[in-house]
Amino acid sequence: MPARESIIWNVNLSIEKREALSRYEPATGKWSAWRAPGDEPRVYAVYVDETDKVWVSEWTAQAMLRFDPKTEKFEAFRSSTGRPNVRQIHGRKGEVWTPESATDKIVVYRY
């Protein structure tokens, strides 16, 4: 995998409900995509932490997803606050911060 500075991560929102996490490598022009787990995933925000794990908010499962690009696996962290509706993800070393627009709370995930 190329150096993290040369990778662009994004989430694809679509009316066809084919939401996916995507990676673009400008040096090669290559796109890769991974469908979020679940029957009808609704991905929204994306954040890459300092260990190169990719965090994605997922509305249908009411969870934060952590994607490992090396194993290409998602890990889900379910919300205990109901429908969190995370629209942004912020972080600092060892933490991911998720402001929940539906609950007016900030949830911190430590790893």
Language model: regions and residue ranges:
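Beta-rich, blade/repeat-based domains predominating
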Residues: 1-10, 39-53, 82-94
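Blade-level signature of beta-propeller repeat domains, shared across WD40, Kelch, NHL, RCC1
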Residues: 83-111
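Surface-exposed loop/turn positions within WD40 beta-propeller blades
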Residues: 18, 28, 51, 60-61, ...
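A short beta-strand motif characteristic of beta-propeller blades
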Residues: 30-36, 73-78
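Conserved beta-strand positions in repeat-built beta-propeller and related beta-rich domains
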Residues: 7-18, 54-59, 98-102
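A short loop-to-beta-strand structural motif that recurs across blades of beta-propeller domains
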Residues: 19-23, 62-66, 105-107
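Conserved active-site loop/cleft motifs that coordinate metal ions or position small ligands
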Residues: 55-57, 66, 76-78, 89-90, ...
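Short loop/turn segments that connect beta-strands within beta-propeller blades
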Residues: 25-29, 68-72, 110-111
